[in-house]
Amino acid sequence: MELEVPDEAESAEAGAVTAEAAWSAESGAAAGMTQKKAGLAEAPLVTGQPGPGHGKKLGHRGVDASGETTYKKTTSSTLKGAIQLGIGYTVGNLSSKPERDVLMQDFYVVESIFFPSEGSNLTPAHHFQDFRFKTYAPVAFRYFRELFGIRPDDYLYSLCNEPLIELSNPGASGSVFYVTSDDEFIIKTVMHKEAEFLQKLLPGYYMNLNQNPRTLLPKFYGLYCVQSGGKNIRVVVMNNVLPRVVKMHLKFDLKGSTYKRRASKKEKEKSLPTYKDLDFMQDMPEGLLLDSDTFGALVKTLQRDCLVLESFKIMDYSLLLGVHNIDQQERERQAEGAQSKADEKRPVAQKALYSTAMESIQGGAARGEAIETDDTMGGIPAVNGRGERLLLHIGIIDILQSYRFIKKLEHTWKALVHDGDTVSVHRPSFYAERFFKFMSSTVFRKSSSLKSSPSKKGRGALLAVKPLGPTAAFSASQIPSEREDVQYDLRGARSYPTLEDEGRPDLLPCTPPSFEEATTASIATTLSSTSLSIPERSPSDTSEQPRYRRRTQSSGQDGRPQEEPHAEDLQKITVQVEPVCGVGVVPKEEGAGVEVPPCGASAAASVEIDAASQASEPASQASDEEDAPSTDIYFPTDERSWVYSPLHYSARPASDGESDT
């Protein structure tokens, strides 16, 4: 394994994946560069004469003299060719190796292969400059692709068989984006710190996908590096959130922040601008209305994903939302006429599993409920405030931003000038809470008037909204929203009470612990469950008939063990209990058995309560109240512990000779 050449300073922040229509040769790249913000730094490139757009840079992305996009002074055509050559070799070589389980060391493996321009016995000849291609964690990423149903030949066909298409509206991150011709995958250039963070994230990402592959988080299919001319260009292959075959009428990048979260004037001049939080609140005050089942599944998925991101200390992520307006498209088709209908091609659905928005949030897979996604193209059915039918394509993006020192400084500086709770850069816990609250209460809302259609067998698992017809529409007053009565808590044990667990384990606990805390708790639980002789709870133990904690003192003058309440810091009451059956005291030491009188013995039980007022009431009055069950294990000072439950022992009638004391 060879050492990598250090990169030049990489200071540009990662931005949103803002994909729209297909890119068309150099003209698309030149047009995209003219729409950038006016304040971009200008620096001349090494080669070529200045031309239109020459010298404009955003991060490492620029334009050369011919108008072609460059990244780290490497032309886009050269980068695309190197990526396709490298992936074709590495994936093909890996497919010849036998499959095996993923090991811990597999997450840190880096394979490297040299591609000379004249070719070698392992690599083909090419007309690019010599380069070295590195593949990170090939075995681990092969497992991820298999988990999402992506076969090696399909992966190679999508990435290497057809030319990659550069997106003309890449956003403000300074990255270059490519999409495959079949709309399956997005290739994005990432910075050194982002690639390094993804490598550290892989073990936890592996655990996350194992527990729940249905997530709105990005699906990473590969991490690669092209090394040429002393430059390292790292790229990541991900799922495509916004398919090009579906026309997006609106596009939003939402974070739950309000500080400078409005699309700029230059952005709004684009053919498909990326709007932000304040734009959404202004243009869609009623939010996006979903039926009950869809809303519940979406909220549950968002809650789980936010807890995962918080546990990894990830922040500054966004929800990419693409809105396809069905009614608007039908009106556009009617205006254009039926002349183009005969030539229209029906779009092909994406092949990867869990890649669409509907598949990412579906919660009924365990019950076998599904719908056919041909009509929705994987979008989530919704209705806006005007009653227009929509299809939503959503995904969480830009998760490779950890809360590092520079982010802490950025938030501190912004908080001094503006309200600290409104800026987008924030600590991970607060960021997750604000993000989840904004999405579950402002962006998405539950509508009781939307009914679910009967389920069909297919790839999706949620129930779709019934078609309302091409001319059907509801007014905002006819579509009630249930936003005001329900508040959703990110860390609540059950934030959405109508959801069931579906037989799947939760991804993370309500309050995500650190790795050290989780390990310590696991060891402590194992030791306590294996070393303590604790009777199992019988089926007859219910909430109405629980077990209680009791403590015994040494025998009194009459030889009977005396039960007395012990002084504790907690508030307590003393309850007099007269059992009608015999109870045995089992001390911790083996062989030391003490017998309790069969009946009639007065016993004092110490029961902990929370209310301070009840602690001062008489014992006779407190004994009439319902006893509080004990849920923990108590170890008395005299090293005796026993559990009393009348249902655990056979009842024995009291003899006539026994009397109450």
UniProtKB/Swiss-Prot annotation:
Which stretches does UniProt call biased (Low complexity)? Answer: 525-534, 605-622
**Outcome reported for the amino acid change (mutating L647V):** Abolishes interaction with AP-2 complex
Question: What GO molecular function annotation could you give as one example from this UniProt entry?
Answer: talin binding
Q: Residues bearing Phosphoserine?
A: S554, S645, S655, S659
Q: Where is this region: Disordered?
A: 44-69, 525-572, 605-661
Query: What gene, per UniProt, encodes this protein?
Result: Pip5k1c
Q: How is it modified after translation?
A: Phosphorylation on Ser-645 negatively regulates binding to TLN2 and is strongly stimulated in mitosis. Phosphorylation on Tyr-644 is necessary for targeting to focal adhesions. Phosphorylation on Ser-645 and Tyr-644 are mutually exclusive. Phosphorylated by SYK and CSK. Tyrosine phosphorylation is enhanced by PTK2 signaling. Phosphorylated at Tyr-634 upon EGF stimulation.
- Domain PIPK, which positions? 75-443
**Enzyme class, first EC level, given as a word:** transferase
Residue positions where Asymmetric dimethylarginine is found in the record: R459
Residues with PTM Phosphotyrosine: Y634, Y644
Q: What membrane topology does the UniProt entry give? A: Peripheral membrane protein
User: What is the protein name given in its UniProt record?
Assistant: Phosphatidylinositol 4-phosphate 5-kinase type-1 gamma
Q: What is its EC number?
A: 2.7.1.68
Activity control mechanisms = Activated by phosphatidic acid.
Q: Please list the reactions this protein catalyses.
A: a 1,2-diacyl-sn-glycero-3-phospho-(1D-myo-inositol 4-phosphate) + ATP = a 1,2-diacyl-sn-glycero-3-phospho-(1D-myo-inositol-4,5-bisphosphate) + ADP + H(+); 1-octadecanoyl-2-(5Z,8Z,11Z,14Z)-eicosatetraenoyl-sn-glycero-3-phospho-1D-myo-inositol 4-phosphate + ATP = 1-octadecanoyl-2-(5Z,8Z,11Z,14Z)-eicosatetraenoyl-sn-glycero-3-phospho-1D-myo-inositol 4,5-bisphosphate + ADP + H(+); 1-octadecanoyl-2-(9Z)-octadecenoyl-sn-glycero-3-phospho-1D-myo-inositol 4-phosphate + ATP = 1-octadecanoyl-2-(9Z)-octadecenoyl-sn-glycero-3-phospho-1D-myo-inositol 4,5-bisphosphate + ADP + H(+); 1-octadecanoyl-2-(9Z)-octadecenoyl-sn-glycero-3-phospho-1D-myo-inositol + ATP = 1-octadecanoyl-2-(9Z)-octadecenoyl-sn-glycero-3-phospho-1D-myo-inositol 5-phosphate + ADP + H(+)
What keyword terms does UniProt attach to this protein? Acetylation, ATP-binding, Cell adhesion, Cell junction, Cell membrane, Cell projection, Chemotaxis, Cytoplasm, Endocytosis, Exocytosis, Kinase, Lipid metabolism, Membrane, Methylation, Nucleotide-binding, Phagocytosis, Phosphoprotein, Transferase
Query: Where do the record's region annotations for Mediates interaction with TLN2 lie?
Result: 636-661
Q: Name one Pfam family in it.
A: PIP5K
Query: Omega-N-methylarginine-modified residues are where?
Result: R459
Found, by tissue, as follows: High expression in brain. Also detected in lung, thymus, heart, testicle, kidney and embryo. Highly expressed in forebrain, in particular in cerebellum, hippocampus and cerebral cortex.
Please describe, based on the UniProt annotation, the reported consequence of changing W642A.
Abolishes interaction with AP2B1
User: Could you tell me the Gene Ontology terms of the biological process aspect for this record?
Assistant: axonogenesis; chemotaxis; exocytosis; phagocytosis; phosphatidylinositol biosynthetic process; phosphatidylinositol metabolic process; platelet aggregation; regulation of postsynaptic neurotransmitter receptor internalization
Q: How does it assemble?
A: Isoform 1 interacts with TLN1. Interacts with TLN2; interaction stimulates 1-phosphatidylinositol-4-phosphate 5-kinase activity. May compete with beta-integrins for the same binding site on TLN1 and TLN2. Interacts with ARF6. Interacts with AP2B1. Isoform 1 interacts with AP2M1; phosphorylation of PIP5K1C by CSK disrupts the interaction; clathrin competes with PIP5K1C. Interacts with CDH1. Interacts with CSK. Interacts with PLCG1; interaction is abolished upon EGF stimulation.
Residues bearing PTM N6-acetyllysine: K265, K268
Q: Name one GO cellular component term.
A: uropod
